[in-house]
């Protein structure tokens, strides 16, 4: 242990106290022992250090900071170096605000386009997500503070996120949902990792020994601190035993007593507590020293410029009929759409940044060299039909050569705590687009959304520019691309399906009960569409440019490829060269092809460069459930190089030496998984893939039933609570402004009451509430009262002792 000299001076109460937060965003300090507190802060796309009363949902004001493009946006750059630059700037701002741990980046796999938090995540592909996240982590930690990649693991939905159980087979777990984290841990060495709220195969992620001990610490060599998501601790003692370091936020002193009792009863050893404490102290002393040395100011103008560059390099040109873009100087334009005046530039929830400044698209156009004939709102942002707004916009469109129509999802359509209902744009926006296209065919749609959308309206626009969520400088970045100041080089980090009905998870997202079946297995995103031969609107890795690129002279070996790429167009630009690995004759079923390498290259007009893309230990491996290890199937592999997953330009074959393990599925009946046709996998086949029966899905009246599920209990008071919360939630959604706090409460398990109320409610009181829900009204009420009195008395005495430490 690095800090044994300090640990041996602490009694058990002091040790246990340090393993829980001291406030909503600060760890506990023991000044008498020389142990300071440190501050943690949200920040996947900017620092969100709260100035006043703290909360974990981003509802209260925070200190102004640069709002960079979201992770979903920067992922479209396919440029880990750009991610590193953004991460370094965020780390600089965090250190200036005396923040020691920046809670990000998020690299959950985009299993479904409807996940409400997809704007915070990089990709449907673990290799791309891992490489981008590693760049962010390296950048953040250059400042001496800690990055905190999240949410570990298999957390791809918002509905019931604190109580849902992700049921996933071991191979899919390893290859798809853990590989990104593996890349981050091994390549960027984050000082912390955040565990997710959900259960994974029956055990909460934060106390899952298989995830935290077997894989994260033993297999990957992680030696940092594991931090719970806020309120994500279920059994604190079991979490400490199995590798979770710090419980956040301040859960009250009852959690300390819970941990002490576990040690005293032999449930866990004091050595487990000491091991976690050593991890925490290393984090505290290491990052505290860096923060104390850091300047208290930063160059906000330089960071704004970086935010604009990052947004511009991440913009994806999805359509450009007749080379309408870039616009010529002096082009007569009309600007339509509410998003032009009030940009949608970030997501809602805990990642929301109080931006230092926010550029307006209308303001940025004044220096573009374009001739703007006017602006019209065109539609109501929340989707309400308004004929007057539409008529005004259509009239204006007739006065311009080109119409710039700013469309997108509003702030509440994509939010922490709430999954999307569909992949559609609001009908009033589509009505406006159709009406404008009828009077002016030169329509450029500028799209703001954090995830993929259905695009049956594509015929009504000549150009489609996807800005995703571009941060505070995203508007200026759009102008840069429209005018040709920047040649678009972004590529989609997720597949855009023709319709949600084509999605491989349409029948299993987000799950109707406690369990969420990952029945599709490996076939997420392009892995499904290409294996099953399903057409899509825009494939993974797709993006147009104002120039063109030629690929030639492919040379391949098992260790990687080299090729020559030439800019054959009329302007300088960047190309993302993508390397996919395929084994058409595979005995062990696998997707048709998988991304295993990429490189972004900048080329002047007529310039050629040799591009090298290495292949690492993840290129050919698969997880063998029989040998419980990574294996390689020997034989011939195709190395496919292209501009997208569907635009393969060059192919070569290499022979790879295998590890000799037999096919683990050779005697298992898995017809749907062998073909990729996984939209209707029967129960028996999914159970065969799991290697165990499918868990029963039912609501249990226990500590982990949600407040919304109290309606299924036997307590009239519980019925009332569930009904009131449900009514408030329904009304807020009908208003077009879902209340994030109500959403969180509705889906919050009862045990979280003991973790999120600053000690006002103890776990004993929660047990009394459970008894109420079970129908033992009088006994339950008495239990709540007795435990409340006990909690107050014990908290007072414990805090007095700790303050005197």
Predicted segment positions?
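Glycoside hydrolase catalytic-domain context in secreted enzymes
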Residues: 1-622, 636-641, 645, 759-760, ...
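Terminal connector regions
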Residues: 617-664
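Long, acidic serine/threonine- and proline-rich intrinsically disordered regions
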Residues: 661-662, 711-789
């Amino acid at each position: 242990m690095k800090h044994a000299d300090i640990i041996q001076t602490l009694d058990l109460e002091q040790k246990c106290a340090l393993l829980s937060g001291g406030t909503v965003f600060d760890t506990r300090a023991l000044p008498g022992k020389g142990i300071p507190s440190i501050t943690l802060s949200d920040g996947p796309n900017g620092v969100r250090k709260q100035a006043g009363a703290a909360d974990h949902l981003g509802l209260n004001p925070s200190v102004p900071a640069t709002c960079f493009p979201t992770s979903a946006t920067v992922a479209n750059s396919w440029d880990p170096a750009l991610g590193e630059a953004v991460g370094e700037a965020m780390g600089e701002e965090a250190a200036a605000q005396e923040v020691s741990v920046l809670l990000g980046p998020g690299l959950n796999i985009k299993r479904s386009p409807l996940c409400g938090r997809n704007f915070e995540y990089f990709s449907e592909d673990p290799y791309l997500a891992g490489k981008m996240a590693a760049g962010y982590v390296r950048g953040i930690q250059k400042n001496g503070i800690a990055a905190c990649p999240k949410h570990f693991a298999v957390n791809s939905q918002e509905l019931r996120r604190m109580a849902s159980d992700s049921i996933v087979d071991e191979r899919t777990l390893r290859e798809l949902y853990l590989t990104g984290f593996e890349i981050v841990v091994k390549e960027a060495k984050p000082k912390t990792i955040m565990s997710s709220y959900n259960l994974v195969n029956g055990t909460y992620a934060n106390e899952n020994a298989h995830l935290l001990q077997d894989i994260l610490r033993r297999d990957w060599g992680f030696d940092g601190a594991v931090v719970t998501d806020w309120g994500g601790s279920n059994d604190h003692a079991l979490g400490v035993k199995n590798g979770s370091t710090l419980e956040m936020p301040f859960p009250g002193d009852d959690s300390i007593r819970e941990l002490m009792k576990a040690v005293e009863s032999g449930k866990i050893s004091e050595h487990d507590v000491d091991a976690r404490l050593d991890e925490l102290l290393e984090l505290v002393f290491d990052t505290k020293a860096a923060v104390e040395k850091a300047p208290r100011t930063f160059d906000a103008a330089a960071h704004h410029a970086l935010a604009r560059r990052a947004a511009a390099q991440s913009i994806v040109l999805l359509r450009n009929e007749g080379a309408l873009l870039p616009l010529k100087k002096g082009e007569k334009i009309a600007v339509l759409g509410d998003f032009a005046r009030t940009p949608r530039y970030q997501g809602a929830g805990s990642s929301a940044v109080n931006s230092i400044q926010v550029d307006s698209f209308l303001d940025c156009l004044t220096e573009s060299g374009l001739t703007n004939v006017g602006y019209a709102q065109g539609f109501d942002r929340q989707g309400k039909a308004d004929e007057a707004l539409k008529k005004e916009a259509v009239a204006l469109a007739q006065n311009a050569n080109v119409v710039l129509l700013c469309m997108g999802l509003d702030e509440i359509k994509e939010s922490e705590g709430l999954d999307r209902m569909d992949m559609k744009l609001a009908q009033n926006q589509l009505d406006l687009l159709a009406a404008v296209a009828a009077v002016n065919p030169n329509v450029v749609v500028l799209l703001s959304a954090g995830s993929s959308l259905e695009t049956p309206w594509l015929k009504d626009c000549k150009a489609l520019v996807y800005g995703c969520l571009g941060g505070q400088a995203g508007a200026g970045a759009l102008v840069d691309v429209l005018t040709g100041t920047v040649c678009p080089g972004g590529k989609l980090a997720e597949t855009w399906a023709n319709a949600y009905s084509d999605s491989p998870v349409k029948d299993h997202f987000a799950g109707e009960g406690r369990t969420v079946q990952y029945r599709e297995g490996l076939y997420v995103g392009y892995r499904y569409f290409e294996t099953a031969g399903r057409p899509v609107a825009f494939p993974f890795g797709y993006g147009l440019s104002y120039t063109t690129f030629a690929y030639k002279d492919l040379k391949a070996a098992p260790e990687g490829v080299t090729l020559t790429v030439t800019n054959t167009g009329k302007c300088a630009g960047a190309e993302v060269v993508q390397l996919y690995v395929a084994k058409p004759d595979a005995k062990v079923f696998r997707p048709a092809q998988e991304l295993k390498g990429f490189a972004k290259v900048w080329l002047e007009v007529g310039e050629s460069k040799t591009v090298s893309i290495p292949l690492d230990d993840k290129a050919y491996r698969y997880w063998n459930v029989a040998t419980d290890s990574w294996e390689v199937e020997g034989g011939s592999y195709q190395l496919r190089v292209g501009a997208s997953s569907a635009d393969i330009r060059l192919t070569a074959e290499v022979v790879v030496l295998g590890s000799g393990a037999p096919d683990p599925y050779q005697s298992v009946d898995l017809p749907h998984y062998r073909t990729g046709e996984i939209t209707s996998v029967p129960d028996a086949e999914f159970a065969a893939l799991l290697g165990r029966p499918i868990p029963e899905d039912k609501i249990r009246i226990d500590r982990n039933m949600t407040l919304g599920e109290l309606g299924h209990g036997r307590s009239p008071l519980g019925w009332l609570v569930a009904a009131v919360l449900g009514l408030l939630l329904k009304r807020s959604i009908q208003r077009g402004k879902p209340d994030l706090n109500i959403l969180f409460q509705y889906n919050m398990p009862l045990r979280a009451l003991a973790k999120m109320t600053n000690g006002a409610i103890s776990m004993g009181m929660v047990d009394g509430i459970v008894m109420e829900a079970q129908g033992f009204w009088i006994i339950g009420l008495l239990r709540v009262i007795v435990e409340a009195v006990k909690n107050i008395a014990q908290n007072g005495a414990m805090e007095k002792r700790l303050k005197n430490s």
